[in-house]
């Protein structure tokens, strides 16, 4: 499996979308370690590379 490198814009969009999902009641995929804010949990999921969001890019 190839580790995908995201641009800063993709990371911002992914974290924002996942934080919204968590705030709306989606299950958390990492140990929260006392984090209560959805943004912190979304960032932890991205760092752990288990965030359930994919990026589709145009082929050039």
Curated annotation (Swiss-Prot):
Superkingdom in the source lineage: Archaea
EC class: transferase
Catalysis performed (reactions): RNA(n) + a ribonucleoside 5'-triphosphate = RNA(n+1) + diphosphate
Gene Ontology CC annotations of this record: cytoplasm; DNA-directed RNA polymerase complex
Record key words, sorted: Cytoplasm, DNA-directed RNA polymerase, Nucleotidyltransferase, Transcription, Transferase
SMART domains reported for this sequence: RNA_pol_Rpb6 (SM01409)
InterPro entries for the chain: DNA-dir_RNA_polK_14-18kDa_CS, Pol_omega/Rpo6/RPB6, RPB6/omega-like_sf, Rpo6/Rpb6
Main subcellular location of this protein, as a coarse class: cytoplasm
Enzyme Commission designation: 2.7.7.6
Annotated GO biological process: DNA-templated transcription
An annotated Gene Ontology molecular function: DNA-directed RNA polymerase activity
Compartments, as annotated in UniProt: Cytoplasm
Protein task: DNA-dependent RNA polymerase (RNAP) catalyzes the transcription of DNA into RNA using the four ribonucleoside triphosphates as substrates.
Subunit structure: Part of the RNA polymerase complex.
Family (UniProt): Belongs to the archaeal Rpo6/eukaryotic RPB6 RNA polymerase subunit family.
Protein name: DNA-directed RNA polymerase subunit Rpo6
Species of origin: Methanosarcina acetivorans (strain ATCC 35395 / DSM 2834 / JCM 12185 / C2A)
